[in-house]
Amino acid sequence: MLQKIILATVVAFVLSLASGPLFIPYLRKLKFGQKVREDGPKSHIKKSGTPTMGGIMFITATVISTLIFSHWNKYLAILLLGFLGYGLIGFADDFLKVYFKRPLGLKAREKLIGQFLLAIIISYFAQEYVGTEVIFPFLKTTIDLGNFYIPFIVFVIVGTVNSVNLTDGLDGLAAGVSFIVMAFFTMTALFLNNITYGAFSAALTGGLLGFLRYNRHPAEIFMGDTGSLAIGGAIATAAVLTKLPLILPLIGIIYVAEAFSVIIQVLSFKLFGKRVFKMSPLHHHFELSGWQEQNVVYAFWIVTLIAMFLSFYSLS
């Protein structure tokens, strides 16, 4: 199994890396460039026009590598449903922005309806395939959620998807953090001796590493919602199928911090007319506090690495 895990990682890495010189110029030719938010940090203005929808690179690499090294079964079908389903929602959002010049892409309501419907489908099949028990980290026990399972899992999936999306705001941030998170799920699958989860997680880990070659600062391409929603779907679905949704606030601590910074900022401004952060999501707050973009990214990577070791400890 270890050999297949390594090969799945390497093949996805090579495919993702090799697609860059072909895909990036093609997106430039199509003028599929990212529009930078006008109220964002001034240092980001120069990024306007950078090719987006780069998630297609590691999505394609991941799917090909997974199908080569994994066995087709109902668990893999659900993993790919979460990965490709949310990637498709992101693709529709990106395509409306860059092709039809619709600045906001899909309407928030349209996006949420799609996200919730997909989450309900995934949670239903997860309940059928793995039951309603989830592992409680640190306590080394399981909790049977019973009738609360589907509502809880829907919340976890939609929350994770949107939290990853919010994290994708600096060069290499979401890709690097998610690389570490997927490495955690790869090693977890290895301990479980499950090639289905292992091959998929390893392939996405390798695909993200290959993509980082072009997404690190200064980024040649952005993953877009195509990539960030797909990653969120993959992480959430992997956590659900391994009975580890409760590990997500720990291994995904950066995602949680980014999401809560937005929630706190909005609530604080609406209730008290004051902003807690200089700008949200959290990574922009650090930028406006004088941090270099690369230093924010490296710090968030390090925090995720620490969270990974704590996550392993919580399950040992």
Swiss-Prot record:
Top-rank lineage group of the source organism: Bacteria
Cofactor list: Mg(2+)
Principal EC category: transferase
Signal peptide (UniProt feature, chain positions): none
One annotated GO biological process: cell division
Topological type in the membrane: Multi-pass membrane protein
Entry's EC annotation: 2.7.8.13
Localization in the cell: Cell membrane
Record's keyword terms, sorted: Cell cycle, Cell division, Cell membrane, Cell shape, Cell wall biogenesis/degradation, Magnesium, Membrane, Metal-binding, Peptidoglycan synthesis, Transferase, Transmembrane, Transmembrane helix
Molecular function terms, GO-annotated: metal ion binding; phospho-N-acetylmuramoyl-pentapeptide-transferase activity; UDP-N-acetylmuramoyl-L-alanyl-D-glutamyl-meso-2,6-diaminopimelyl-D-alanyl-D-alanine:undecaprenyl-phosphate transferase activity
Predominant location category: membrane
Known pathway: Cell wall biogenesis; peptidoglycan biosynthesis
HAMAP family, per the entry: MraY
Family the entry assigns: Belongs to the glycosyltransferase 4 family. MraY subfamily.
UniProt name for this protein: Phospho-N-acetylmuramoyl-pentapeptide-transferase
Origin species: Thermoanaerobacter pseudethanolicus (strain ATCC 33223 / 39E) (Clostridium thermohydrosulfuricum)
Phylogenetic placement of the source organism: Bacteria, Bacillati, Bacillota, Clostridia, Thermoanaerobacterales
Name of the coding gene: mraY
